[in-house]
Amino acid sequence: MPKLRTTSDQFFKAKIFNQNITFVNLSNQPTYVQSRVLRLKSKEPETIDWIESIPVTDTLFDVGANIGIYTISAGARGIKTYAFEPHSGNFNILCQNISANNFPCTAYCIAFSNKSAFDIMGVKNYHPGVADNTINKNKEYNHGVVVHDLDSLVEVNALPQPHHIKIDIDGHEDKFYQGAKKTIGKCKSVLFEIETQYEYIVDELKNQGFKIIGKHKRNENEHNFIFSK
């Protein structure tokens, strides 16, 4: 269980995997990050266990990184981690969290899809930590976003081929998968939060040689699937 201690109004420190980690406090939600860190093992224990199973010499992609709770956790183990987060407020805090820790993590403000384009992302609000942001769907607020298919970026070596990939993208699973099939197929393991309407992806991953080693209910409409080869 992570241990927490506040060091200032701006930052607080915790401990995970026997490493000290630092996070930025959110002024609009002063207990949000603290509660997320303290609930790491209870909220998504399968995610922490999966991160703990990754060899430290491997590379991880965290797609839909939010403010970097799991990015930093992976970095604390020495795993080279690439974090992708298109929400402007989340990306700002994600970068600050990476900067506050001397871990091998890099962040990119990009959304992955099945095409290369400028698009619109619907967001609940602009507060850091917000989730359930969706590409090209109406929300109360919107902002522009650069989208790209992951396969093309890996093929031209703009990004490395990851060994492992974590995907949490709030209803955008279909278009993401269509643009990332080749890259995913070459991974050792995948943690994919999938809504029920997109569970065809499970069968496709099985056809690529993956086995389901974990299935964890997140709510009535989505599960965390863990796949391995």
Q: Where are the regions that the model predicts?
A:
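A structural helix-start
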Residues: 88-91, 116, 173-174, 198
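S-adenosyl-L-methionine
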Residues: 1-152, 155-157, 201-229
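Non-catalytic surface loops within mature trypsin-like serine protease
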Residues: 18, 27, 114, 123-125, ...
